[in-house]
From Swiss-Prot:
Residue ranges of the region described as Disordered: 855-889
Disease: Epidermolysis bullosa, junctional 7, with interstitial lung disease and nephrotic syndrome: A form of epidermolysis bullosa, a genodermatosis characterized by recurrent blistering, fragility of the skin and mucosal epithelia, and erosions caused by minor mechanical trauma. JEB7 is an autosomal recessive form associated with congenital nephrotic syndrome and interstitial lung disease. The respiratory and renal features predominate, and lung involvement accounts for the lethal course of the disease.
Source species: Homo sapiens
Gene3D superfamilies: Bicelle-embedded integrin alpha(iib) transmembrane segment, Integrin alpha, N-terminal, Integrin domains. Chain A, domain 2, ntegrin, alpha v. Chain A, domain 3, ntegrin, alpha v. Chain A, domain 4
UniProt name for this protein: Integrin alpha-3
Positions contributing to Ca(2+) 1 binding: 315, 317, 319, 323
Residues binding Ca(2+) 2, per UniProt: 378, 380, 382, 386
Cystine connections: 94-103, 140-162, 185-197, 485-490, 496-550, 615-621, 694-702, 846-904, 911-916
Single GO MF annotation: laminin binding
Membrane protein topology class: Single-pass type I membrane protein; Lipid-anchor
Cytoplasmic topological domain residue ranges: 1015-1051
Expression tissues: Isoform 1 is widely expressed. Isoform 2 is expressed in brain and heart. In brain, both isoforms are exclusively expressed on vascular smooth muscle cells, whereas in heart isoform 1 is strongly expressed on vascular smooth muscle cells, isoform 2 is detected only on endothelial vein cells.
Amino acid sequence: MGPGPSRAPRAPRLMLCALALMVAAGGCVVSAFNLDTRFLVVKEAGNPGSLFGYSVALHRQTERQQRYLLLAGAPRELAVPDGYTNRTGAVYLCPLTAHKDDCERMNITVKNDPGHHIIEDMWLGVTVASQGPAGRVLVCAHRYTQVLWSGSEDQRRMVGKCYVRGNDLELDSSDDWQTYHNEMCNSNTDYLETGMCQLGTSGGFTQNTVYFGAPGAYNWKGNSYMIQRKEWDLSEYSYKDPEDQGNLYIGYTMQVGSFILHPKNITIVTGAPRHRHMGAVFLLSQEAGGDLRRRQVLEGSQVGAYFGSAIALADLNNDGWQDLLVGAPYYFERKEEVGGAIYVFMNQAGTSFPAHPSLLLHGPSGSAFGLSVASIGDINQDGFQDIAVGAPFEGLGKVYIYHSSSKGLLRQPQQVIHGEKLGLPGLATFGYSLSGQMDVDENFYPDLLVGSLSDHIVLLRARPVINIVHKTLVPRPAVLDPALCTATSCVQVELCFAYNQSAGNPNYRRNITLAYTLEADRDRRPPRLRFAGSESAVFHGFFSMPEMRCQKLELLLMDNLRDKLRPIIISMNYSLPLRMPDRPRLGLRSLDAYPILNQAQALENHTEVQFQKECGPDNKCESNLQMRAAFVSEQQQKLSRLQYSRDVRKLLLSINVTNTRTSERSGEDAHEALLTLVVPPALLLSSVRPPGACQANETIFCELGNPFKRNQRMELLIAFEVIGVTLHTRDLQVQLQLSTSSHQDNLWPMILTLLVDYTLQTSLSMVNHRLQSFFGGTVMGESGMKTVEDVGSPLKYEFQVGPMGEGLVGLGTLVLGLEWPYEVSNGKWLLYPTEITVHGNGSWPCRPPGDLINPLNLTLSDPGDRPSSPQRRRRQLDPGGGQGPPPVTLAAAKKAKSETVLTCATGRAHCVWLECPIPDAPVVTNVTVKARVWNSTFIEDYRDFDRVRVNGWATLFLRTSIPTINMENKTTWFSVDIDSELVEELPAEIELWLVLVAVGAGLLLLGLIILLLWKCGFFKRARTRALYEAKRQKAEMKSQPSETERLTDDY
């Protein structure tokens, strides 16, 4: 098949307008390959809006002169002035020059005869095709209209018309190809037959055939026509689809060739983009009698995608059979931002094509990717055909270049030509039409002609591709002994290059300059080698060819070399610098001076230099590093658990490393032996023994030796500060990893785990362990009590809980438990609890379960109340001015006992358990317990005692389900001394009137007695004699001896 036009035919004007309204989006960034975008051949012709470039073709003229031409259709071009026609369309031929405006209009003489045919707006140039070297040219006008008359009424038939011209683009009347009418449609029929067939919407040549597409035939079902010439015989073929439906557009695009479904016979491939609304491609073969028979139909997969609007044939995998590419420019995937597709069907050795594509290429949304597709030949001369795909509505238009291989078309484009980067003012819809497969500048590489709707065509010429066929990189010596290095050289590297042209042109001997970069130890920082005369491990150089050249470079070892085990990798990469034009000049610039390296070749080479090592004859060290590790105490005792508290400050880790020979491993030197420790944030490196063996950053690195010798042993003792253990810490994990640059494949990381038992530290204290109180007054029963003051004297205990330093945060609860003396042994109330309040970061009541606090619901007193003084209490118990029962008193003759003790441990009191949770708080928490002495119990049962002492216990403990958190219980005692204030009984008081009466009666009685004595002469004075007699008698009485004296005198 010749290099005919390979753009998708564009028939109706309405369709063209719709395409122009599409918005470009997306993009693809691909490194350029060998289509040159600097030295473009750009042509502009026609009047503005002529659509110059709507169709394009490359043509080689060999008659009358030797030259290459760029053919471009301008279907909206103005007519040659004749006074009757305004617009007909045109075809321009453009020479291969550096000028933009030297195109000539092709001479196709069409006379205007409105009575028989209409050439106004016939779209001449909608199709342009070349038969190849020394071949003819085909030009079509699909809107050419014939006029039929029925009486005075005319009927118009848009049958279309195609013109064949000679190799020199002139009419040769002796050539049957050119003089044949090529009128395949019958204008005497209507649109239901071929009266509106629009012949020439697509068309092309082979060596002995010319073919046309007519998508308007049979109510726009469409048809395909072919004229075949064999020597003097001429045969016409056509295809009428048996399906009874219109609007399929068969013939919208056509390609004809062999090695499709038969190695010799030709196969017609025609697109029908509206077949069943999803589009299809028909494969037809010749039948006797001039018919084309349908052999296979490939259907599209999406409604409205216009599958089949562009097709191309190319042997992608070099199996000798032509493969098929089908464009679907309106294909879309909304979620993936895809717009346009190319379906690739690989030929199954001439039997058929698979129903589903082997590859589906996508373009960006709104790009119309696949609106044009063309086989452009082997542009890089790698032996495989290449493909160009147009995306005219992506920005200002783009053309994607795909290469192929033995497996078919490569998925990723090798080059993307961006219309906006070409620097052409007014350019748009770049890539609307494509034509290739011809080397127009004769440099052995086919070129590509690209058309647009903006009155521009652009020729992209292929640059020569250079293969580097001989590249060597040889170090000397290959095994380096640092002891043999000199001040000027340790390693010498020799590198050599040679090239050829991929097209195999033996005359191509251009002087090219190859830039190369050598880098020593690229994967290591810092590198171990540097180039002589420099401190750098990188060297940049240039080679000038075509003759093979070699170069030698000297390298030196860096100072303080540590790694002498791993080889030094010396890498080389090279490139061909972009050469800028020497100076402006007239004429078309040859691209032979601007070659490009073959991108399919590896542009990098490397070699390595080994170190001389004491590791056996193979120079390969096989170490046997082994390690034991454990957490230990300061007495070197192994720890399985860490009993942590805030007093713990240090933790020790003992590590033993050996490198000894075993039956399985030789235990040779371990180069760059390193121990890496990954420790949790709770541990901070404090010290290492031996000193300086380890360095800490986020990870701890301990250098064991370089090398760590055979049979060497080493012990490390690492001390850590424990700084971050919390209640959430269940364990401490340390990962230990031995590493060496020697060969050892069993160096697995060791995970060392130390369980942590966290011991909370807090305190429990009291403001006053022992309180003073009293009892006395009257006995009152429960039913008579209304307020807590009716119970008895108040008590107030204050407990203080020290802060833990760290909140439990849901891991447990700190609880204050009280062993509270609640009753005496006979069940009577003892100390009646009225209220418990917790004060920390706030204040709230504590309500232990069991309704043990103020169970009688008595009215609480003012929180500010304090116990009354004994004097005040005595006055309150004074019955003189009050009412009610008299206070209980002690018998005046009875003396009370001194003291008794009530405690639950002796059974003389019964206790209940009260619990109050202590909140997480960084401050001291106060727990206040208020109670009342049950006065009646003490009056009834302990009235005989001066003092009753009641004892209780308080315990602070931790309640948690986590076994690693614990706390030592804190216990304290509390008590109250309750003194008796009962008074002794007093004598009964006598009424005043009785006293007055008694006094009066006494005085009266005394008077009577005196009177009586007086009457009896008691008050009369005695005589002198009687007086003296009395005195003498008294004296006699005084002088009488006593009985004792008398008894004494008897002896």
